[in-house]
Curated annotation (Swiss-Prot):
Originating species: Listeria innocua serovar 6a (strain ATCC BAA-680 / CLIP 11262)
Locations listed in the record: Cell membrane
Main localization of the protein described in the UniProt heading: membrane
GO molecular function, a single term: metal ion binding
Family: Belongs to the fluoride channel Fluc/FEX (TC 1.A.43) family.
Superkingdom of source: Bacteria
Record comment: activity regulation: Na(+) is not transported, but it plays an essential structural role and its presence is essential for fluoride channel function.
Catalytic reaction list: fluoride(in) = fluoride(out)
Keyword set, alphabetical order: Cell membrane, Ion channel, Ion transport, Membrane, Metal-binding, Sodium, Transmembrane, Transmembrane helix, Transport
A Pfam family: CRCB
GO terms, biological process: cellular detoxification of fluoride
Transmembrane segment boundaries: 3-23, 32-52, 59-79, 90-110
Keyword Magnesium in record: no
Protein name from the UniProt record: Fluoride-specific ion channel FluC 2
Length: 129
């Protein structure tokens, strides 16, 4: 059942990432990849602990959401390819900026996601069905 959930949520996550590429794609800067990775960092840090604590969702389904949807939505490989392409185009400053914004931004988004999740958990949020 785990693989089914990962597959279903993975398809949904991949489609959402594709939609973000259509919406934000184009230009010299890989803004769509940056956006999905930062959003994914926040979602993983916020949703997973919150749902694990406050919902009746099974662990298998919860892992399907995290591994499937968020795993397919985010993309380390596109980040790596985008960075190499920027370097090959001679955009060294842009490539370094992209790396720094991705890494530092990802850590900041995880911090915000956890903080927001913890805040809701402390408030005694009701069950999510």
């Amino acid at each position: 059942m785990y693989f089914l959930y990962v597959g279903i949520f993975g398809a949904l996550g991949g489609m959402c990432r594709y939609a973000m590429n259509l919406w934000l794609g184009g230009g010299d800067f890989p803004s769509a990849t940056l956006a999905v990775n930062l959003i994914g960092c926040f979602l993983l840090a916020f949703i997973m602990p919150f749902l694990a604590e406050k919902s009746r969702i099974s662990l298998v389904l919860l892992n399907g959401i995290g591994t499937g949807f968020i795993g397919a939505f985010t993309t380390f490989s596109a980040f790596s390819v985008d960075t190499i392409e920027l370097l090959q185009q001679g955009e060294v400053v842009l490539a370094i900026s992209y790396i720094l914004v991705s890494l530092i931004g990802g850590l900041v988004m995880v911090k915000f996601g956890r903080r927001f999740s913890n805040k809701l958990l402390r408030r005694g949020a009701h069950h999510v069905d």
